[in-house]
Amino acid sequence: MTLAEEFKSRNFSIYGQWTGVLCIFLCFALGVANIFHPTFVIAFSIVCLVSSFVIIFIEIPLLLRICPTSPKFDAFIRKFSSNYMRAAIYGVMSVVQWISIWPQATSLIVAAIFLMVAAIFYALAGFKGQQFQGSKTLGGQGVAQMII
């Protein structure tokens, strides 16, 4: 299945996964950009940076196979294999970034918006009863097994 066919499949988990990939870049860039604020925003930017690395392992399953990680971390990441669990973690990460507006309004709101959109996509996939379908481009559905 090509990338265009994946998007035409109307499976919201595919949309959520690609929104999650966009969140990786946004969280990393905005976390670095906001880490130099002299206010309490630094804590939220660090959380945003950590979120970007967690999302990398959630959305790109191939990395769990090629990166040396601990069994505890692997078990933690594997908890987010269903649409509802992914919606939950994206929702929590989004709420944390929405709270970052309290000390000072910064560009972290963009990360909050996109994390919320990813959570909505995964929640819609769960509500519609769609099975989680990983994108082949990101290492889902057999790509990891082909490398090993």
Swiss-Prot record:
Transmembrane segments: 12-32, 40-60, 82-101, 107-127
Record carries keyword Glycoprotein: yes
Membrane-topology descriptor: Multi-pass membrane protein
Subcellular location: Golgi apparatus membrane
Xref: InterPro entries: TVP18/Ca-channel_flower (IPR019365)
Function in brief: Golgi membrane protein involved in vesicular trafficking.
Protein name: Golgi apparatus membrane protein TVP18
Organism: Phaeosphaeria nodorum (strain SN15 / ATCC MYA-4574 / FGSC 10173)
